[in-house]
């Protein structure tokens, strides 16, 4: 096992920390959104509230530690540091693919982090494609029970699997199997991409199948075609991956598309999120929760305190943004007219 899934997880972490793994000339699209400064905000900064909720639990901020890793010695340190920090700051917390945990108890501590985060909304994760490779509702429920998680998210990563040496490529007829997971698992089931994005048409099909929430995981941050290109030992795969160095739908476009199709669905924005200003922009165009992944990874390699400092900076940046437009809570931020999208001010409407 150490030379299989677990080794791959360690390689992924190392490459995300040290490699050139962002898409080429690909952004989140959020740079096209600008806030219109309010010189007279008429609020007290001390009154600004970031309180939110997700999966039926209260959050101190509308933030999620997005799925990153699990199933290796290095992942154990990372996930435990993230769990301690998420509990302290009141964030939601997701862990990386739990397939390795279903197959072996090796490095189980990287997944068993509920003790470090007893009250945080906890999400476990497995590839949706595994529903075509022997996994089903029973395995999904088992991993929820083993980790005492609040939810499971199925990740859609077709292009990553295509580029990955030995990837699982049978994505045929997954939707009815996803629907069965939603019907049989006794917890909310979400779906996320891994950095290439989910649009409104796909989100509608998933939501109609019973999915509880959508994480768009758009382009503009880590490109898994580039991560797998750096890992690949196959010259043909490596060369082909280069053609996909700017593949994917930008996070901003995903949010607009999904929110337009599903006005009421719980929506997570992730993919290239680096600042609290990014988060504010995402919330303004439809996100309920904002996920951060690689932006937290370097700190998670150190200590929980390092992660907490990074989290506190993101929270402060979000509060400063809200102060700058006179929004005292997230509802006011969502409904603000003090935003310009691609040069079109909502204040003019």
Curated annotation (Swiss-Prot):
Cofactor annotation: FMN; NADPH; Mg(2+)
EC number: 5.3.3.2
Keywords: Cytoplasm, Flavoprotein, FMN, Isomerase, Isoprene biosynthesis, Magnesium, Metal-binding, NADP
Subcellular location: Cytoplasm
Record bears the keyword Magnesium: yes
Residue sites binding substrate per the record: 8-9, 97-99, 160
Amino acids binding FMN: 66-69, 97, 125, 192, 222, 272-274, 293-294
One term of GO molecular function: NADPH binding
Positions that bind Mg(2+): 161
First-listed, main subcellular location of the protein, grouped into a coarse class: cytoplasm
One cellular-component annotation, GO: cytoplasm
EC top class, as a word: isomerase
Oligomer status and interactors: Homooctamer. Dimer of tetramers.
Function recorded in the entry: Involved in the biosynthesis of isoprenoids. Catalyzes the 1,3-allylic rearrangement of the homoallylic substrate isopentenyl (IPP) to its allylic isomer, dimethylallyl diphosphate (DMAPP).
Protein name, UniProt field: Isopentenyl-diphosphate delta-isomerase
Organism name: Oceanobacillus iheyensis (strain DSM 14371 / CIP 107618 / JCM 11309 / KCTC 3954 / HTE831)
Gene: fni
């Amino acid at each position: 096992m150490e030379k299989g899934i677990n080794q791959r997880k360690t390689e992924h972490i190392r490459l995300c920390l040290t490699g050139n793994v962002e898409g080429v000339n690909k952004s989140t699209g959020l740079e096209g959104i600008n806030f219109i400064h309010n010189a007279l905000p008429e609020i007290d900064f001390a009154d600004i509230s970031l309180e939110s909720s997700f999966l039926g639990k209260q959050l101190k901020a509308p933030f999620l530690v997005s799925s990153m890793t699990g199933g290796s010695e290095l992942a154990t340190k990372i996930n435990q540091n993230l769990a301690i920090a998420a509990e302290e700051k009141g964030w939601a917390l997701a862990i990386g693919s739990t397939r390795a945990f279903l197959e072996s108890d090796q490095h189980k501590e990287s997944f068993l982090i509920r003790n470090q985060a007893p009250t945080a909304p906890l999400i476990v994760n497995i590839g949706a494609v595994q529903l075509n490779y022997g996994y089903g509702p029973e395995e999904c429920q088992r991993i929820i029970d083993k980790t005492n998680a609040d939810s499971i998210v199925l990740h859609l990563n077709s292009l990553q699997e295509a580029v990955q040496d030995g990837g699982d490529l049978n994505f045929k007829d997954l939707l009815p199997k996803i629907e069965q997971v939603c019907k049989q698992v006794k917890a909310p089931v979400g779906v996320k991409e891994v950095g290439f994005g989910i649009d409104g048409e796909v989100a509608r099909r998933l939501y109609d199948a019973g999915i509880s929430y959508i994480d768009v995981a758009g382009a503009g941050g880590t490109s898994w075609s580039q991560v797998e290109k750096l890992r690949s030992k196959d010259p043909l795969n490596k060369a082909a991956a280069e053609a996909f160095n700017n593949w994917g739908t930008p996070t901003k476009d995903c949010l607009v598309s999904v929110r337009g199709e599903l006005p009421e669905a719980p929506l997570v924005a992730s993919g290239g999120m680096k600042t609290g200003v990014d988060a504010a922009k995402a919330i303004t165009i439809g996100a309920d929760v904002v996920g951060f992944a690689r932006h937290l990874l370097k700190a998670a390699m150190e200590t929980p305190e390092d992660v907490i400092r990074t989290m506190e900076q993101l929270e402060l940046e979000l509060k400063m943004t809200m102060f700058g437009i006179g929004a005292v809570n997230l509802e006011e931020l969502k409904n603000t007219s003090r935003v310009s999208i691609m040069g079109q001010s909502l204040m003019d409407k």
